Regions:
Chain A
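C-terminal boundary and immediately downstream tail of ABC-type ATPase nucleotide-binding domains
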Residues: 211, 221-242
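ABC family nucleotide-binding domain
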Residues: 1-220
Length: 242, 219
């Protein structure tokens, strides 16, 4: 589904990604972790072309992302993305947030879009707030709406960029619950997160990044059992021993 | 000192002054709408990253902002007749729109830049094109954020319309001036129009305060 091949990226003379190669198969849940500044958020933003890459190639569902001829809006319309800071549109009500992409991009009618939107809101438990504005909801609720907004486009895979990092601890669970449910339904997911509990529960593979490189790319059991690299061992021992 | 004043000249001149006021409003509204539309396009051109387009827009804005409005009004009125037949009123409408566009463009540029990058990414991420993202996500928020400044600029614009006096277009001030001279009561008429300008600007500013409360985005 997602193939990342020898991807390198620079910001000016600073290299943020170095020769990253990995893939996410259909139905697979891959967790990307690593210290801050390791390039994991940058890597996931390259997958749907929000960040350009200088070297290598990224292929999503058979379409090359870094080809100038690629219709990026079309590609992105079926790759859902959830951001660290939710990024709901603050000037639209919750249901409008879910309808806008369906109407403007997929060409659905308002009624159809609202109906589909309400179903998804019901699923993430926000139905009663459909007519409120994003600023009236808690962070956890906003992030669940953001997931519903991504799902409203009927995505073939979902990208999560630190979806719980901006949340109060007690709201993390409500967002993770929705994500676990998605994973168990067989959604293809690439998730940048520090939530190792989530990784243990639903991930198939875990990728560990440091200094813009993929240091470890292993099945979950192997990664949590005995990571190959020292750096990953250090990282795990620091975040797991509490 | 008011004993020598004769305010009885006001009622008979009202219909004529009204016409002047209507033109002042027409000028304000035309320059505001035209200015915001052209100004937004100029702002987008400057932010687009396109070198030639951005440079052209920047040159235009810098040029317009470096010349006093009164000079622009005079120059346009003096030069335009070489290219077309033009009344002072039409000349004023065009000059004001072009001039205000430069100021509105700077306001809109600040407004657009105040929208976080993440919002643009969110628009892109659900498959919107650049223009869809601008039109549905960025500009609606930029306008809301900028309403107080846009309206302040519009007050200044409304007050500046009195400058068309210089080219003889009949706005509120010119109309008052004409009737004042007709009756030999210029000072009374100036006092009267000052009160009109004050009443309009003051009530508009009350309206702006009310609007700000209504359309502010809950964050």
């Amino acid at each position: 589904m997602i193939q990342i091949q020898n991807v390198s990226k620079w910001y000016g003379s600073f290299q943020v990604l170095t020769d990253c190669t990995t893939q996410v198969s259909k139905g697979e849940v891959v967790v990307v972790c690593g210290p801050s500044g390791s390039g994991k958020s940058t890597l996931i933003k390259c997958v749907n072309g929000l960040e350009p890459i200088e070297k290598g190639s990224i292929i999503v569902n058979g379409t090359k992302v870094n080809d100038p001829a690629t219709d990026l809006p079309k590609l992105r319309s079926h790759v859902g993305m959830v951001f660290q800071h939710f990024e709901l549109f603050p000037h639209m009500s919750i249901i409008q947030n879910l309808a806008i992409g369906q109407v403007k991009v997929l060409g659905r009618s308002q009624d159809e879009a609202h109906e589909r939107g309400m179903k998804l809101l019901d699923r993430v438990g926000i139905k009663m707030h459909a007519n409120k504005y994003p600023g009236e909801l808690s962070g956890g609720q906003q992030q669940r709406v953001a997931i519903a907004r991504a799902l409203s486009m009927d995505p073939i895979c979902m990208l999560f960029d630190e979806p719980t990092s901006a949340l109060d601890p007690e709201m993390i669970t409500e967002v993770l619950d929705v994500m676990v449910e998605l994973a168990q339904e067989g959604m293809t997911m690439m998730v940048v997160t520090h939530e190792m509990g989530f990784a243990r529960k639903v991930a198939h593979r875990v990728i560990f990044m440091d200094h813009g490189q993929i240091v470890e790319d292993a099945p979950k059991e192997e990664f949590f059992g005995k990571p190959h690299s020292d750096r990953a061992q250090q990282f795990l021992s620091k975040i797991l021993n509490h | 000192m008011f004993s020598n004043f004769d305010f009885s000249v006001i009622p008979p001149s009202l219909p004529y002054i009204w016409q002047g006021l209507v033109f002042s409003f027409r000028l304000t509204v035309t320059a505001m709408l035209g200015g915001i539309i052209i100004g937004t396009l100029l702002a987008l051109a400057r932010l687009s990253g396109g070198k030639a387009l951005g440079f052209a827009a920047k040159t235009y804005v810098d040029l317009m902002r470096s010349v006093p409005l009164l000079m622009m009004i005079l120059w346009f009125f003096l030069l335009a007749p070489f290219f077309m037949k033009i009344t002072p009123e039409t000349s004023a409408l065009i000059t004001f729109t072009l001039f205000q566009a430069a100021f509105y463009s700077e306001i809109m540029r600040a407004g657009i830049q105040s929208i976080p990058r993440g919002q643009i990414n969110a628009g892109f991420a659900i498959g919107m094109s650049y223009w869809q993202t601008m039109g549905n996500v960025v500009l609606p928020q930029a306008f809301r954020n900028m309403v107080p400044v846009l309206l302040t600029q519009t007050f200044i614009l409304f007050q500046d319309t009195s400058l068309v006096y210089a080219i003889g277009a009949t706005d509120l001030l010119k109309a008052a001036d004409n009737t004042g001279k007709l009756y030999g009561r210029t000072v009374e008429m100036y006092i009267f129009v000052s009160l009109i300008y004050f009443a309009i600007c003051f009530s508009l500013s009350m309206f702006v305060k009310y609007m700000n409360k209504r359309i502010a985005i809950i964050r």
